[in-house]
Curated annotation (Swiss-Prot):
Domain of life, source organism: Viruses
Protein name: Uncharacterized protein ORFC
Annotated Basic residues bias: 1-11, 38-48
Source organism: Psittacid herpesvirus 1 (isolate Amazon parrot/-/97-0001/1997)
Gene name of the encoded protein: ORFC
Segments for region (Disordered): 1-127
Length: 372
């Protein structure tokens, strides 16, 4: 009987030191309950998903399993970046887009995984990728660090990180956005006369729909103003919170986006890494710092808005409480990258001025992270 149930090892295994020999039966029963529990959970999972024979055969051939809610996302295989020619070098405050000088982005940067080509490479930003089942996953994987920030993974892992008070962990490395901010071109608003553009009018771009009108616990403005734009030469959607709806044209043009990256990409899980609430608090703090320290010195105004970047195609993220609490929502699937939009005044600006505006947003993010 033990051989049939696969419990021979449990029976012949030595007992725990200090345990009595009469407890051998309980070990056998525990092994049986564990095996029965596995079988029961497996049958429930299959019945809930409704797998057919064809799909089971395909899954057995590919030897793949669907990720469960809460599972960590596997990172693509790493490569040697010492010979990479497509990485963007940190310049004087601006990021050179991939492909701007005739060098196209790599397949992994466009959404490939493990060297596989992705059909949505042109529509997928460099900070997003698709897994083997074409599901959108968190971008900025270790393979993309040199492409986006112009530094190696070793250099990025050496950047300091503040202590995580909530989890009581030791200080870990933080991929600081101060290395290089993302240069985002906001081309056109997806709203006309205060009304949101329908999906039919906007084409592939989504129309925003409020799913939960209840006020947020941490921030009240849950409906971002959506814009069409580009980042790294690829189309994106940019959502700007607290945007002045009477002056939406002021948000058009080239601006910086400082992403909020809580941990190194290899440790990315949705619950621990990205936080739109922290980005919102950091934007408010950055506006206060600019008003107090630099407005009188430069005379030009810089505005900081919390926002998020999303792919030009795909499902709309749900920024509401309901979206955050739902395991099946795009919010939980990490289909957007939160951060701060640094809206610079129009005209020619000194490099030091632009760099100072970006570093102020970086400082605000790092300050707010310490209070989480």
């Amino acid at each position: 009987m033990n051989k049939i149930l696969g419990l021979r090892r449990a029976k012949s295994a030595p007992l725990v030191p200090g345990a009595e020999k009469g407890k051998e039966k309980s070990v056998e029963e525990t092994g049986f309950m564990t095996l029965a529990g596995r079988l029961r959970r497996g049958m429930q999972r299959l019945s809930r998903r409704g797998y057919g024979d064809n799909r089971r055969s395909r899954g057995s051939e590919n030897n793949e399993q669907d990720p469960q809610p809460g599972d960590k996302i596997a990172s693509p295989q790493r490569r040697d970046y010492t010979k990479s020619e497509a990485s963007c070098r940190p310049g004087s405050g601006k990021t050179s887009p991939c492909g701007s000088s005739g060098t196209p982005c790599s397949d992994d940067a466009g959404g490939g995984r493990n060297g596989q080509e992705n059909s949505g490479t042109r529509d997928t930003p460099c900070w997003m990728y698709k897994d083997s089942k074409s599901r959108y996953r968190v971008g900025v994987t270790p393979d993309l660090i040199p492409t986006i920030f112009g530094v190696s993974e070793v250099a990025a892992s050496g950047l300091p990180r503040c202590r995580d008070k909530a989890a009581k962990r030791q200080p870990q490395s933080l991929l600081s956005p101060g290395v290089e901010a993302l240069l985002v071109t906001i081309a056109e608003s997806l709203e006309t006369n205060g009304k949101r553009v329908s999906g039919r009018t906007a084409g592939k771009l989504w129309s925003w729909r409020v799913r939960d009108k209840a006020p947020e616990r941490d921030y009240r403005n849950v409906t971002p103003t959506m814009f069409e734009g580009s980042c790294f030469g690829k189309p994106i959607r940019a959502g700007v919170f607290n945007a002045p709806r009477a002056y939406l044209d002021d948000l058009l043009g080239d601006h910086y986006f400082v992403p909020y990256l809580r941990r190194l990409p290899r440790d990315f899980t949705r619950e621990e890494t990205l936080s739109l609430r922290v980005a919102t608090e950091a934007a408010v703090f950055a506006n206060m710092l600019w008003e107090a320290r630099h407005k009188n010195n430069f005379g030009a105004g810089v505005s900081y808005y919390p926002g998020a970047l999303a792919s030009a195609t795909g499902t709309a993220p749900d920024f509401t409480d309901r979206g955050r609490s739902s395991l099946d929502s795009p919010y939980f699937a990490s289909t957007f990258l939160p951060g701060i939009f640094v809206i610079l005044p129009p005209g020619e600006l000194p490099i030091d001025f632009m760099r100072l505006a970006v570093l102020l947003a970086v400082s605000a993010i790092e300050t707010c992270v310490t209070t989480v």
